[in-house]
Each structure stands twice: as structure tokens, then as C-alpha cells.
């Protein structure tokens, strides 16, 4: 956060300001992870049906790994992948790493920009589950399937996955 401040601010980064920014960052990092209602039960259902679940998220690896650990949801996932950017190349890389068959692999997410559209571009099927708290930077038009047989589902709630998978 201090580096970002230095890049974006005209104000000089003093020792006092650096200390305040670090204290703020520690409060953010320690904030409890808020789980959307029904997510643990839905993940349990999917894992119980022998679906191979891989969590792919973007951001700082240490921060994202900590969030996953603190969420209590890590046990539902066969793997957790933290990438710098969720784009078609990243989805291809993860699919290759885990030898995923794109004809039967689904991406589930709330962001057209970072989840649905790049997954479709990478040849995966996609499920779009909109959420009110999705960052505005993640908004864009939903793409369309790119190949024959590819599917895009839109569900109202994460828990609706249990009716489809």
C-alpha cells in the first residue's frame, strides 16, 4: 500500500504516514472473510458429487492464500491458483497444469471481465452468478460461447449450482 501511495500521491510519504498506512493494511488483512450465504453448503454438495474443484483467484499470492485459509473453505478445493490476471491465457495455463478437459470443465464466477469472458475465450463452459458487490471494474457485457457445444449459464444465486451440478 505504501508503494501505491507513493505512485499515486503528490504528498511525500513520511515515516508517520507509512506507519498509519501499514496499520490500516494490517486491519484490512485481519478483517474476517465474509462468506456469501449458502457457499459452504454448495461447495460441500459439489465436492460430494466428486467434482474436482479448483479455486482460481487473482491478486497478491500471500494475501489471497491467507484469505482462502481464513475462509475455512480451502478443504473443498483440490487446488488453489493465485494468478496476476485472470485472462484467457491464465485459464489455458491452469487447464493444462491440471490436465482439464475443456469440453467438460466449467468456470463459475461473478465477473464478466475476469471470469466468464476469458473462460469462454479459453474454451471452457461458464456459469455467471452476478453479485451486488462485484467491483465496477469487473463489469462488461457477457460474451457468448465461442465453439459448438460450449455453454454459458446465468444463475441468480450460488446455491442454484446444486440444481445443475
Task: Identify what each model region corresponds to.
Residues 17-21, 38, 86-87:
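Short, conserved alpha-helical segments within structured domains
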Amino acid at each position: 500500500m505504501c508503494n501505491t501511495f507513493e505512485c499515486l500521491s503528490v504528498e511525500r510519504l513520511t515515516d508517520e504516514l507509512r506507519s498509519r498506512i501499514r496499520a490500516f493494511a494490517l486491519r484490512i488483512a485481519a478483517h474476517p472473510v465474509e462468506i456469501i450465504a449458502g457457499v459452504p453448503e454448495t461447495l460441500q454438495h459439489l465436492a460430494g458429487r466428486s467434482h474436482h474443484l479448483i479455486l482460481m483467484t487473482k491478486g497478491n499470492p500471500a494475501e489471497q492464500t491467507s484469505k482462502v485459509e481464513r475462509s475455512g473453505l480451502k478443504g473443498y478445493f483440490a487446488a488453489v491458483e493465485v494468478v496476476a490476471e485472470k485472462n484467457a491465457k491464465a485459464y489455458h495455463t491452469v487447464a493444462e497444469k491440471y490436465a482439464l478437459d475443456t469440453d467438460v470443465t466449467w468456470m463459475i464466477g461473478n465477473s464478466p471481465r475476469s471470469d466468464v469472458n476469458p473462460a469462454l475465450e479459453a474454451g471452457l463452459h461458464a456459469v455467471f452468478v452476478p453479485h451486488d458487490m462485484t467491483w465496477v471494474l469487473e463489469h462488461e457485457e457477457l460474451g457468448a460461447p465461442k465453439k459448438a457445444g460450449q455453454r454459458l449459464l446465468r444463475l441468480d444465486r450460488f446455491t442454484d449450482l446444486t440444481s445443475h451440478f
